[in-house]
Amino acid sequence: KYLKTGFATPSGKVELYSETLEDLGFDPLPYYREAAGTNEEYPLRMFIGLPDDEYFRTGMRHVPELRKRVPDQTFFMSPNDAERLRIVDGQWTRLTTKVGSVFGRVFVRSSMPDGLVRVPHGWWKPESKKGLENMSGMWDFCDARITTDDDPELLDLEQGIPHMKGVPCSVEKISETEIARLEKAYGPTNELKRGPEGKVLRSDAKPNDFMFDEFTGDGIEFEAIELSLYGRNTI
């Protein structure tokens, strides 16, 4: 196709140096930007955008069997971070960024690196109250509530797309009063199902053979996409 039509660039070729970006006042070459730094108020970094393994984006939360496996929004966290924050597995917490906060239950996994929190995408509870005031739990659980929208340190300057990784955040335990409010609105807190710890493929162990699928044990390098594929492993 592209041998005949060329690419959708002024030259019709692959352009590593973009004259279009240059005309708009941006750097015409790819460049690296340091992630926004953490601080005392927001000592952790979160990444969002990946759904729970059991669901498809924002969908399928009405399926009883899937909700038995993952009944609530969960925050994936390393054992060291959980111990430092005095949070136990399955405990209700609040995750806060500079733009907002959501509730979720901590899911301690040895494959998570220290300092990083994974927040699954698109949480809501279709069985709960609807309407603008409640939005079926979206105001309490959805990652859209904590995604920055105007911080230049956390935006793709060329397109205005918010960063989904490396966003400074904090996680803290919530009070019994707050837990009671959540349970009144959304039902009792049920046990979080736990499957065996998923094994993650070391990036430095990958040979050129794309069929290679040998996995290693704990304490290995973390890669976000591999956590999405293998992290919870409840089946």
Please describe what each predicted stretch is.
Residues K1-E65, E214-F215:
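Long, low-complexity segments enriched in small/aliphatic residues
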Residues H62-F76, N80-I235:
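Long, contiguous, secondary-structure-rich segments that constitute the structural scaffold
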